[in-house]
Amino acid sequence: AGTLETFRGQVIKRHTSNMESLMLESFQKLLRKTELVKALSIDSSTFEATLTGRDGKNLPFDRLSAGERQLLATSMLWGLARASGRPIPTIIDTPLGRLDSEHRSHLIERYFPNASHQVLLLSTDEEISNDYLEALRPAITRSYLLDHDETKGSTSIKEGYFA
């Protein structure tokens, strides 16, 4: 391999190593089972992610609950955003759907206020309860309600979703 190819490989390994640590740190902040995952590795040629469990063995993604897989995906996006070093707006649709109450609290307290300089949450009316709203309120600049009118077949935007 030539000098340029060697340099390219070194840069990719350095960046994947940084992403591994940021993604793992993000995942561990969101999980309620703090000892579930010991390591997260990314293959620098295929970019395939692998989890290592507390026992030191490979932890297949299908051994994670649906909520844990959702948190893993969120952690990967959070880690990538943090690794980029750029302010990237984050849009999250129905963010709390599959999660138990403890994982919901972790997202509300640890992720949403820190995910980006600008976070758009597209939530259902059931997802953000009064307790969650109070925890998020310091980070909310504006809120809107998407109001669908069946007869007109259109949706209007109204200010004050949490009013």
Question: Over which residues does each language-model region extend?
Answer:
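GG-anchored amphipathic helix commonly corresponding to the ABC/SMC/Rad50 NBD signature/C-loop
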Residues: 26, 66-92
